Design a protein with these regions (language model features):
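Membrane-proximal intracellular helices of multi-pass ion channels
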Residues: 1-201
């Protein structure tokens, strides 16, 4: 299961991008990077393609580690129970946006906190990674004016509001408003990023 999760994670950013980051490059490497990396403007990040690929993978790794850290904080503060093995595999499945889970029930067995962490990171891993590079370089205006990202979050927010309202008005699905919004947000994040995790029918 770990190997399956790891290869899933490795392919999330693209195996070719990984290779570009660690092996000598030719003049044709720009085409590989454009084809394999998420986001249309990655080639404009820095002049050298190898540097661009390394930056993308550094961001990808840092976000994966951050998700694992939030899982472990949940265990530390008693907000949920999850093993190190499950933490790693779920983080890999979230980062790869393919939703590979080590349990048959997906994330339904985990606490609301652990599900919320997964929701946030599903959405974050669905963002164009060049935007994170711009944020790291403090080019906030360029990141903010990215129409792809703005519409991405507008669609997510709108879907959560509309679906939650529909479920609350029809009634009987979840016992509380919080649980309704919680499960809807998770499902919307899962669907829009094609991750495919589930918490409820």
């Amino acid at each position: 299961l770990f190997w399956r999760s790891f290869t899933h994670w490795l392919g999330g950013m693209g195996v070719l991008v990984f290779m570009l980051a660690i092996v000598p490059l030719s003049g044709e490497s720009i085409y590989l990077l454009r084809a394999e990396s998420p986001g249309p403007s990655v080639s404009k990040m820095v002049p050298k393609m190898r540097t661009s690929a390394a930056i993308l993978y550094a961001i990808y790794c840092a976000m994966t580690l951050l998700q694992i850290l939030f899982y472990r904080l949940g265990v530390l503060f008693g907000w949920g129970e999850i093993t190190w093995f499950d933490s790693l595999c779920l983080a890999f499945g979230t980062a790869g946006t393919g939703g590979f889970s080590v349990r048959n029930s997906g994330l339904a067995d985990y606490s609301a906190y652990l599900q919320a962490v997964t929701t946030v990171f599903m959405v974050l891993f669905g963002v164009n990674f060049s935007v994170y590079f711009f944020l790291l370089r403090r080019r906030f205006r360029l990141a903010w004016h990215n129409s792809e990202v703005r519409w991405y979050f507008i669609i997510i927010f709108g879907a959560i509001v509309l679906i939650s309202a529909n479920l609350l008005l029809t009634g009987g699905f979840f016992p509380t408003v919080f649980q309704t919004i919680h499960h809807v947000a998770f499902s919307v994040g899962s669907v829009i990023t094609t991750t495919g995790f589930g918490t409820a029918d």
